[in-house]
UniProtKB/Swiss-Prot annotation:
This is tRNA1(Val) (adenine(37)-N6)-methyltransferase. SUPFAM superfamilies: S-adenosyl-L-methionine-dependent methyltransferases. Keywords: Cytoplasm, Methyltransferase, S-adenosyl-L-methionine, Transferase, tRNA processing. Its EC number is 2.1.1.223.
Amino acid sequence: MAFTFKQFHIDDLNCGMPVSTDGVILGAWAPLAEAKNILDIGAGSGLLSLMAAQRSQGQITAVELEEKAAAACRYNMTQSPWAKRCQLVHGDIQHVCQLAQYQGYFDHIICNPPYFEHGPKASEQHRAMARHTETLGFTPLLDAISQCLSFEGYASLILPIQSLARFKACLNDTALFLVREVWVKSVENKAANRALLLLSKTEVEPYQRTDLTIRGEDGNYTEQMIELTKDFYLKL
């Protein structure tokens, strides 16, 4: 499919995971305005990279392992207004983060990690890779973030609520700290099903915990959601 946002276009036809509300929320929420060097781990179609390019003046490095998704990401970047600030690295983040030029280099890292920990795998390999944590589990992901993130930098992620406890257990074994957490409800008066997380190498006490509701009971976007995404969605 193809998606047109206010300032860029995404073709995600050959990507394992298509453009999603999760990705848009994460890209709009992450505090990117002051970032100079931004890393997008598991970039897929390049949605987060291009949102980061729109919201900052920084240099964007997207890392994507799956071949078809990497090709789509490269194409979407070259067609965007920020092609000169975006680069794609086709490879494994665990290898990329060991390269000397990337260690401690990025002042912001964004990632919408694989989210199906259990259950049947998708039939197509590239879709399965995008959706299952077996390709990039929480521990190697956090190791990569720890290696690539600058001391004063931040990492922004979105996870299913049911994965949160396991993620936090893995986080406890790193030098990273949770400094902000937003529980996301799809609909008002329903339980939260996603969490936005902001990580840092510096501990903040107490960390901030807030809520975001996407739609009201009438099915329309809430004022929170409109304010968050109005620079991207065409009809807002």
